Amino acid sequence: MSNIYDSANELSRGLRGLPEYKTVKAAKDAIAADAEASKIFTEYLAFQEEIQKLAQTGQMPDASFQAKMEGFGKQIQGNSLLSEFFTKQQQLAIYLSDIEKIVFEPVSELLK
């Protein structure tokens, strides 16, 4: 029987080999090479982290967060590098969602 960690590492290597992963990586590299896109991306990630911290403490984002999110949405849609990155990331997320279902199936069976 193979070691479960070996299987997980093999899965990780497999994900990195997917064309969708490589496309997302290339899109992220393009963002890193562009000062404006990189700045917006970094600010967006910090904002997402702030929202996650609120959620973890049971707090709800207020109206200012909604306005800020809308602002980021406009900035992302207005920047072709960022827009492409998030589109490609969504395509990769389909694989991740499918894998998550497979991996957690044994756990969900225990809860039935």
From Swiss-Prot:
Q: Which residues form a coiled coil?
A: none
Q: Which SUPFAM superfamilies match?
A: YheA/YmcA-like
Q: Which InterPro entries match?
A: Com_YlbF (IPR010368), YheA/YmcA-like_dom_sf (IPR023378)
Taxonomic superkingdom: Bacteria
Signal sequence: where?
A: none
Family, as annotated: Belongs to the UPF0342 family.
Which HAMAP family has this protein been placed in? UPF0342 (MF_01526)
Q: What is this protein called?
A: UPF0342 protein SPT_0901
Q: What lineage does the source organism belong to?
A: Bacteria, Bacillati, Bacillota, Bacilli, Lactobacillales
